[in-house]
């Protein structure tokens, strides 16, 4: 059984993950509209990843006999000043999520909820990767902003295709 306070905070994080997923869809659609398919694909994949993070949290609450609440989310930002702006927004979002996940870890520790603390550890590791990936992409986009096709080439070379992480928590509904 998850500590009540942890379950409540995790419920808030579910909302944050769904909001991140929606924002990444908006980023992808922006890039699709500019005919930048690799940037679009990158963010469509990020959207799926964030949605799956939310579903992992839902599954944890189900497994911990806590009632998950599926929240509504605010509309994402859909217009941007230039091709770097969506990546800048994504990096800011990933840094904020890192702080939120760290706070979840703090709540689990304060509540002596060792099972929840163990669950959150995977997300901490994931956030290090997310911030690093978005930081690198932002550096490339800023450097190549005048030649977005070179950003597309960079993404093609990097080919960060998602591979299944055997240490990832299970997601509610499976990895849909």
PLM segments and residue spans:
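Iron-associated oxidoreductase/ferritin-like identity signal
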Residues: 1-176
């Amino acid at each position: 059984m998850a500590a009540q306070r942890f379950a409540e905070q995790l419920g808030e994080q579910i909302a944050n993950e769904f909001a991140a997923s929606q924002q990444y869809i908006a980023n992808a659609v922006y890039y699709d509209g500019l005919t930048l398919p690799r940037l679009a694909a990158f963010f469509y994949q990020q959207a799926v990843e964030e949605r799956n993070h939310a579903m992992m949290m839902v599954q944890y609450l189900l497994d911990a006999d806590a009632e998950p609440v599926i929240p509504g989310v605010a509309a994402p930002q859909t217009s941007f000043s230039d091709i770097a702006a969506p990546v800048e927004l994504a990096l800011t979002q990933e840094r904020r999520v890192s702080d939120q996940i760290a706070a979840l870890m703090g709540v689990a520790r304060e509540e002596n909820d060792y099972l929840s603390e163990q669950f959150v550890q995977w997300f901490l590791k994931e956030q290090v990767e997310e911030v690093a990936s978005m930081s690198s992409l932002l550096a490339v986009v800023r450097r190549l902003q005048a030649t977005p096709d070179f950003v597309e080439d960079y993404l093609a070379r990097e080919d960060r295709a998602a591979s299944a992480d055997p240490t990832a928590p299970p997601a509610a509904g499976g990895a849909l």
